[in-house]
Amino acid sequence: MVKSGAECLDVHRPSEILDTLKRLGFRAVVAVPDGWLGEFLVHIEQEPTLQLVRATHEEEALAIACGIRLGGVRTALLVQNAGVLSMGAGMVSLAQRYQFPVLMLVSYRGTPEDAIFYHIPKGRVTEPVFTGLALAHARTDRYRPIGPQVEQAATYAEEASCPFALLLSREDIQW
């Protein structure tokens, strides 16, 4: 049964994301800590079927995720949109060039719902830059269950053999 928009708002979206990653066979999550991601990372770390790898910079995280994926392990990358903006060269010359199907779960800062002055410029350019990099991406729809959206993004990455960035709101990932 498909849930209504109101029912979707009652579901704990971060738990649904975590359950979906496990159900889809993800075994590694590479992350750069962010204010929105902190508690989510704690829950990933507590999952026996998921290995959390913390990186210090987004381009480093991308390289680690691609390396783990090269080893045959289904991998998700968890970063902030500002970090993806800084990893353009690695995205084009590594992840896209060698067709790594990496699911990128990206906290989307600087939107009208996150109108903090220093995030706003990053929010305004995120999607145009992703388009310019030919980075496949989508924003989550808060009125639809998040699990199927994560699954659709992961499936696209696999089928197209490319990274896919799913842009997440605060309610999607804040525990």
Please report, for each region that a protein language model flagged, where it lies by residue.
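Thiamine diphosphate
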Residues: 2-175
